[in-house]
Amino acid sequence: MINEVKKKLQEELDKYLLDKAAFMPYYPGMNVFFSDLYKENLEAASAFVKSQNEAEVKNFNLYLDTIIVNMHTKVKKYKKSIYFDDENIKDIQNQGFSIPFFIDEGKGVYVLLGIVNSEITL
């Protein structure tokens, strides 16, 4: 399962490297962008959290949003991604999920590649 996850994340990174303009900002004017896989994974993660505890889904999304909005101030605290052998790809851990993101130093942006349920894939 982890190889399948790595492959999908790598495909999203490759898409970004080929066509940066195809990625949307997390919020207008932000230097955080998200991939299609991230959007799909967010919907699946929210559904999973809701199936476990319907009241927690709002807290999950709000806390994740807060982390992402403030991630630029804490980039150095995040560890190298377990899915890539690259110092420019790190993982944010949130409530049993990993959010791998790419640091595009040349453009000064961060790209959210996906959301992985750590308990299922590891």
Model-predicted regions and their roles:
Residues K39, D65-I68, V116:
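Conserved protein kinase catalytic domain
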Residues A22, Q52, E56-F60, K79-D86, ...:
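Solvent-exposed interaction patches of small proteins and small membrane subunits
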Residues M1-L9, L13, A21-P28, V49, ...:
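Enriched for short, Lys/Arg-rich terminal
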Residues K6-Y63:
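Arg/Lys-rich, positively charged N-terminal/basic patches that mediate binding to nucleic acids
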Residues D19-F23, T66-N94:
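A short, surface-exposed loop/turn module that caps and links secondary-structure elements
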Residues F33, A45, E56, K74-D86, ...:
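Sparse, context-dependent recognition of short Cys/His-centered cofactor- or disulfide-binding micro-motifs
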Residues L37, N41, E56, Y78, ...:
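A broad, structure-centric signal for solvent-exposed, well-ordered loop/edge residues
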